Amino acid sequence: MKSNSVSESVSVLGAGSYGTALAFCLARNGNPTLLWGRDEKHIAEMAANRENTRYLPGATFPEALVVNADLEDVVAASRDILVV
């Protein structure tokens, strides 16, 4: 069976302190990870800075972590979804 990138990624819904830390750990361990949050301005800042300066300042996101403000895209991209 051919590998499907959708099933290999994990989406974390919630970009607060716990959601960001969880997404960070998942990505750091080699899991393609998507992080979604409801505050579009905050999500844009995290995507631009590659870190969550509100909750985890100084922790640069791993390459495997993608921040996205589009809930539909984030949910559609992963088989595994964590809501925090």
Predicted regions and their residues:
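Rossmann-like NAD(P)-binding element
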Residues: 59-84
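NAD(P)+-binding Rossmann beta1-loop-alpha1 motif at the extreme N-terminus of oxidoreductases
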Residues: 2-59, 68-69
